[in-house]
C-alpha cells in the first residue's frame, strides 16, 4: 500500500546529510526490491546513502545512473510514476562535491526535468545564499578554505558563475535563473500562488539558484515545489 503523496527521494553524497533527519528509511543499498519496500514506507522522505563525494567523477556518475535505473524499475513495479517522486541530489553546503555532474546525470537517466534547483544552505552552520551569492557566516565562500579543496576547489561564490565554472561552460551564467529572498518572503504569505506559477512555467531543465537566508524561506520554497 502506498501513500500517494509525492515521495521525496534524497540521493546523499556523504553520510552527514542523513544525520539531520529521522523517521524515514535510510538505504545503504538500492536494488529494486529494497527500493520497492522503501517506497511503501509511509514517510514522505526516503534517503539513499550513495557516498559519491568520495568517488571519482566517472564512478559518481555511474552510481547515480545505477540508482536512477533501479528507482525507475521500482516505481514501475509499484504502479507509480516518475512524477510521484521529487529527486534531491544532496551535496555539500560549501559547494564541494560533484554538484553539477550528479544532477546532470540524473537528468539524463531519470528525466527530462523542467528545472534543476541549486539550493546550497545549512542555516544552523551559517551557510546561506543571499542575492545569489553563497556565504559562510556572511563571508563569500570562495574566500574560505573550503574553496581551496584539492579535489573540488572553485573561484566564485556567485552561484550562477559557479555553475558555469563547474560545468566548464555547458551552463552559461546568463541562462541561470534566481529565486530571490524577497520572492520567498512573499511566498510565505499571500505570494505563494505567484511563486507556484513561476515554477510551473519552467521548462527544459533550466538551472535555478535559490536564495536561503531564513528557514521560513526554505519552507516557502518547499511548499511551492510540492504543490
What are these regions (language model features)?
Residues 28-35:
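Alpha-helical scaffolding within the catalytic cores
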Residues 6-12, 19-22, 35-37, 44, ...:
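Cap/lid and interdomain-hinge subdomains that line or gate substrate/regulatory clefts
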Residues 225-227:
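Acidic, glycine-rich loop-and-beta core segments that form the ion-binding/anion-interacting portion
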Residues 48-53:
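Short loop/turn segments at strand-loop or loop-helix junctions that form parts
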Residues 27-28, 105:
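Glycine-rich, phosphate-binding/catalytic loops in enzymes
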Amino acid at each position: 500500500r502506498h501513500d500517494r503523496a509525492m515521495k521525496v527521494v534524497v540521493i546523499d553524497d556523504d553520510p552527514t546529510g542523513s544525520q539531520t533527519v529521522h523517521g524515514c528509511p535510510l538505504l545503504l543499498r538500492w536494488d529494486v526490491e529494497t527500493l520497492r519496500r522503501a517506497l511503501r514506507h509511509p514517510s514522505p522522505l526516503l534517503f539513499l546513502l550513495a557516498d559519491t563525494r568520495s568517488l571519482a567523477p566517472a564512478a559518481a556518475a555511474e552510481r547515480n545512473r545505477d540508482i536512477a535505473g533501479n528507482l525507475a524499475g521500482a516505481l514501475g513495479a509499484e504502479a507509480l510514476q516518475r512524477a510521484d517522486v521529487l529527486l534531491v541530489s544532496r551535496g555539500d553546503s560549501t559547494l564541494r562535491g560533484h554538484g553539477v555532474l550528479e544532477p546532470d546525470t540524473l537528468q539524463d537517466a531519470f528525466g527530462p526535468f523542467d528545472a534543476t534547483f541549486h539550493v546550497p544552505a545549512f542555516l544552523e552552520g551559517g551557510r546561506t545564499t543571499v542575492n545569489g551569492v553563497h556565504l559562510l557566516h556572511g563571508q563569500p565562500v570562495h574566500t574560505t578554505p573550503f574553496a581551496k579543496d584539492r579535489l573540488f576547489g572553485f573561484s566564485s561564490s556567485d552561484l550562477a558563475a559557479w555553475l558555469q565554472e563547474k560545468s566548464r561552460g555547458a551552463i552559461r551564467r546568463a541562462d541561470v535563473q534566481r529565486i530571490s529572498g524577497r520572492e520567498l518572503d512573499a511566498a510565505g504569505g499571500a505570494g505563494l500562488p505567484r511563486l507556484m506559477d513561476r515554477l510551473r512555467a519552467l521548462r527544459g531543465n533550466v538551472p535555478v539558484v535559490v536564495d536561503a537566508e531564513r528557514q521560513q524561506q526554505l519552507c516557502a520554497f518547499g511548499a511551492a515545489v510540492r504543490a
